[in-house]
Amino acid sequence: PALLAHDKNELDLAQDFVVFSPSTDIDPDPVSSPNDPGSFRDLVYPESHAPQVQKSSDLVPTADLQARQRHIQLIRATKINPSDLQAWLDLASHQEHLVSPAVDASSMINSERKTLADLRIAVYEKALKQFPENEAPLREELLLRLLSEASITLEAQKYKQKLQDTLQQHLTSFPIWTLYLNACQANPVEFRFEDVKVFFIRSLRTLGSNNNANHNLEAQHMILYLTLRYTFFLRDTGYVELSIATWQALCEYHLFRPEHLAHLGRDFILADFEKFWESERPRFGEEGARGWCIHDQDDGIDPELRSILPDGKLASSLPFKSFSTLENTMNELLRFPGRTMDQPGNEDPFHVVFFSDLQEVLAATTSALSRDGFLDALFCYLGLPEMNDTTITQRLPASRRRWRNDVFLDHGLLHSDLAISDHSNLDENLMPCYQTSTDLLFSRAFQGLSRSSTPSDGSSHDQQTKPDVARFAQRILSSLVQLYPSDDGLAEYYLAFQLSCFPSEASRVAKKILKQRPSSLRLYNACATIEAKLGKTDKAIQIWTGAIKMKASFSAAAQQEFVLLWRGLIWCDLETNNAETAVSHLASFGCGDASIDSES
């Protein structure tokens, strides 16, 4: 008690008043301010080294103020250098920080998105004035971004009109055409088959009537791209016969045109082609097809009556199952265009394709088309990979590569059945999109196709290419190889297809083509590769070594492909576990055929 009294007395003497802070602010935080005298920080830090803690009012400018300051800097950059595209793009991108500071664009509400789109459109329109017409790539970049924002602010019909107006000034712009086609074809609300079909025909006519179409390679490939989109659209909407017939007609028209028509007008050429088509002789890809030019010289035999009536009937006990089976059978039998003499056993008015159904497309594509681009578009439609020819790839414009990446062109004719029957494996059946080589052609380029022309278990859902479609593609490639006897790359491509789809026939076909072209080292390598893939290693090595020994008999141009023989031979050694032989061949590469002679 005495101690307590002593403490109380000292407290009363020393603290008989209350000390207030000089500041008039009232701190709601019960914790002592770090700058208060006598605080813990005064004991740890000397006064001159105490850390300064800023209040919220003293922090750097807010996010809104930062965004405005950055906006001023970007505007200044565009004024200093108006031709700097990146400065304009940065300014447009920054607009989202003005609309909603410190908030990600994905979290914006619809009204904020439209406001942002309007701001960016204004930036792009101002930027376009700074770039003249001769700077097409820069203007195209700005236009694509402007159209992307316009799709947010404009109604569907106005957006399509905006795209159409833009296309009038940029008829050969592949990205803008793609946007336009997607807007017209992929609108589920306003989709009408006839409207979309008319749209494609009108677009082909517009592009085909361009005066520069005959000389502009990009314009030619845009015509091919439109044709691909049109025929894929027909096939996907159930008009398979018209889709296939369109490509048959285009191939006959552009690849097998009679020579005496070369200098005549379009109307005369179309009239002559009408006679050929309405004669109903075998057409491109069909059995017995010889081409428009051959038909023009030889009338041949009248077409035979074909009966394609299905054998199955509806079962009263299982009506739905039997109907499904019969429907699948009819789809396979009626897949390809029919003839008026056929007996399809139904009342399908679209099974027979007349010239009048094709006339508008042919008239719109009468301009000369590049052979390389045309063949690649045809292969894309069939679902085949690109050809192995780096020189062609370097010569073709970017649009040829782009249509290989188009989501609307993912599944070609050879893959269409797989896409319908098994949706779980769509990604596995996509067309390969990469630059092929000889090794890839004979390994995985055709891996999505069947290695057999008949289903393994008879199941309608077997993951294999339908025999009739594979045979159709086979006849097309065979006709092209005969049409271009000097194109060894095309012949190699055909043999790789044979190995994948019809392996039992591949060796015989390879020997036949090699006999016709005995000076092609590429075809020697293809023949040997086929034998090796079929398990006939000794025969493959015999072909490789025999061709290597004949090196001196080949021309200098042909010897440029001599490396293919050595490469194939060495890989064959490795795959058969003959490492020492492979090393020996690798060491003697380029030194003639001494090592081959010593082994034999």
Model regions and ranges:
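Polyampholytic low-complexity alpha-helical segments
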Residues: 1-600
